[in-house]
């Protein structure tokens, strides 16, 4: 949420740096919050109500013993923003996957990101151990089936796109084709430019035939507070079980979309935070607001790290043998699966979603990409035996990778540093606490 995150991070910085918390300062903070929310297209009435609550609480409530006034003011801002985005109503919501075969139906208008969301949701559930399949049910958009097939190949799940002109039949036959090999079948339905009667009839008939356990509306965050109207209309038409909001990373109106949907009572279950198939998060207002304010979300950071460690089984194997550049390459591959560095830094307290994250992550992302390009220019023998890399080989690798000899030497220095860490762990000089790969990652990020 470009702009919005920066604004909120600045508010946090202002509160933390304040020496006196008096009525004038509280009103100044309230005005800053108002400005941030209005620029994010949050409904004016909601903004005014939230402003009054923040001001009233900040001036009337006494902080608990030992808690500085500035910390308590930040807590009030945090709690009220969480409430604005759904509060406890959307806390810890899971999708219903209690049956042997669970059907998830994605609905929405054209251009909202349904097909991409289908693949992202497949990847998300796949990582949780489910066998997922995708079904195309859009006979109107010529490239829809091919797009879904390509995405299914990317996330490595089966896909079925029936060659008929009827959307309902495509859904029915697709679910039937995949039900024996999948725990979860995600149906990517057709959209329209608006919620017309024919779309409503089509979705209702489809729902009657395939009996979905979840009906998720996919909404683009760029529509802002209009998202609430869309959610209400679709809910009336097909009884939604939840909402997925896409493009939240780039939408200036993301705050408006989130708050408008939360106001309808339709649970926001997932948010899309980037273009990669890994960029889908279960929506939790508390951790989401914590990251926007720059106070971190350690639980999410740990979850992502653990997920990567579980996925990369070779990490433990590294400790049993010689650590080579090939091992380093595989660990950088594993690191890239955690998502872009700026996403990871958002979970770290004090980083937030502002400019500081983008500055640091840009340097780190460039370094990791450069390292991979350099190693792609090495032979298998060089990756397995880095000690043979003499001056002439380094020069050849630099030319082949379009980098400098200095860049290649920098990579080799990082490799030797990591190798020393691995050897210390192998010898027992460093205990295996916190994960050896985590230490490698920290060394890479430290640069």
UniProtKB/Swiss-Prot annotation:
GTP binds at residues 108-115, 188-192, 246-249. Keywords: Cytoplasm, GTP-binding, Hydrolase, Nucleotide-binding, Ribonucleoprotein, RNA-binding, Signal recognition particle. GO terms for cellular component: signal recognition particle. This is Signal recognition particle 54 kDa protein. GO terms for biological process: SRP-dependent cotranslational protein targeting to membrane. GO terms for molecular function: 7S RNA binding; ATP hydrolysis activity; GTP binding; GTPase activity. It is found in: Cytoplasm. CDD domains: SRP54_G. It comes from the Archaea. Belongs to the GTP-binding SRP family. SRP54 subfamily. Gene3D superfamilies: P-loop containing nucleotide triphosphate hydrolases (3.40.50.300), Signal recognition particle SRP54, nucleotide-binding domain (1.20.120.140), Signal recognition particle, SRP54 subunit, M-domain (1.10.260.30). Its EC number is 3.6.5.4. Pfam families: SRP54, SRP54_N, SRP_SPB. The keyword DNA-binding does not apply. Part of the signal recognition particle protein translocation system, which is composed of SRP and FtsY. Archaeal SRP consists of a 7S RNA molecule of 300 nucleotides and two protein subunits: SRP54 and SRP19. Involved in targeting and insertion of nascent membrane proteins into the cytoplasmic membrane. Binds to the hydrophobic signal sequence of the ribosome-nascent chain (RNC) as it emerges from the ribosomes. The SRP-RNC complex is then targeted to the cytoplasmic membrane where it interacts with the SRP receptor FtsY. Composed of three domains: the N-terminal N domain, which is responsible for interactions with the ribosome, the central G domain, which binds GTP, and the C-terminal M domain, which binds the RNA and the signal sequence of the RNC. SUPFAM superfamilies: Domain of the SRP/SRP receptor G-proteins, P-loop containing nucleoside triphosphate hydrolases, Signal peptide-binding domain. It catalyses: GTP + H2O = GDP + phosphate + H(+).
């Amino acid at each position: 949420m470009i702009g919005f995150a920066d604004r909120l991070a600045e508010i946090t910085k202002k509160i933390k740096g304040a020496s006196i918390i008096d009525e004038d300062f509280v009103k100044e903070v309230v005005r800053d919050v108002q400005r941030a929310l209005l620029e994010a297209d949050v409904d004016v009435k909601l903004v005014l109500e939230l402003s009054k609550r923040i001001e009233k609480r900040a001036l009337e409530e006494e902080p608990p013993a030992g808690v500085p006034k500035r910390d308590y003011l930040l807590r009030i801002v945090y709690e009220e923003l969480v409430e604005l985005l759904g509060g406890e109503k959307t806390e810890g919501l899971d999708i219903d996957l209690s049956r042997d075969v669970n059907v998830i139906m994605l609905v929405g208008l054209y251009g909202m990101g349904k097909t991409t969301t289908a693949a992202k949701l497949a990847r998300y559930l796949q990582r949780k151990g489910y066998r997922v399949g995708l079904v195309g049910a859009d006979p109107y958009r010529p490239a829809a089936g091919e797009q879904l097939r390509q995405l299914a190949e990317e996330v490595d799940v089966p896909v079925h796109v029936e060659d008929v002109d009827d959307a309902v039949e495509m859904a029915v036959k697709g679910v039937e084709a995949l039900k024996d090999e999948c725990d979860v079948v995600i149906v990517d339905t057709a959209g329209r430019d608006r919620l017309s009667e024919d779309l409503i009839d089509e979705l209702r008939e489809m729902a009657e035939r395939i009996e979905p356990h979840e009906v998720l509306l996919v909404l683009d965050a760029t529509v802002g507070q209009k998202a609430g109207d869309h959610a209400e209309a679709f809910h009336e038409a097909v009884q939604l079980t939840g909402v997925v909001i896409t493009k939240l990373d780039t939408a200036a109106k993301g705050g408006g979309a989130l708050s408008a949907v939360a106001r309808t009572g339709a649970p926001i279950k997932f948010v899309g935070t980037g273009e990669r198939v890994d960029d889908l998060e279960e929506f939790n207002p508390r951790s989401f607001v914590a990251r926007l304010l720059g106070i971190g979300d350690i639980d999410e950071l740990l979850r992502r790290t653990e997920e990567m460690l579980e996925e990369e089984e070779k990490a433990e194997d590294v400790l049993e043998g010689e650590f080579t550049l090939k091992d380093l390459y595989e660990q950088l591959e594993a690191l890239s699966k955690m998502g872009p560095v700026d996403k990871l830094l958002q979970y770290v307290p004090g980083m937030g979603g502002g400019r500081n994250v983008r500055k640091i992550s840009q340097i780190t992302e460039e370094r990791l990409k450069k390292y991979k390009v350099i190693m792609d220019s090495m032979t298998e023998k060089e990756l397995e035996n880095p000690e043979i890399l003499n001056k002439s080989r380094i020069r050849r690798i630099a030319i082949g990778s379009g980098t400098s000899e200095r860049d290649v030497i920098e990579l080799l220095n990082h490799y030797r540093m990591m190798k020393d860490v691995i050897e210390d762990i192998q010898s027992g000089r460093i205990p295996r606490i916190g994960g050896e790969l985590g230490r490698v990652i920290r060394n890479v990020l430290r640069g």
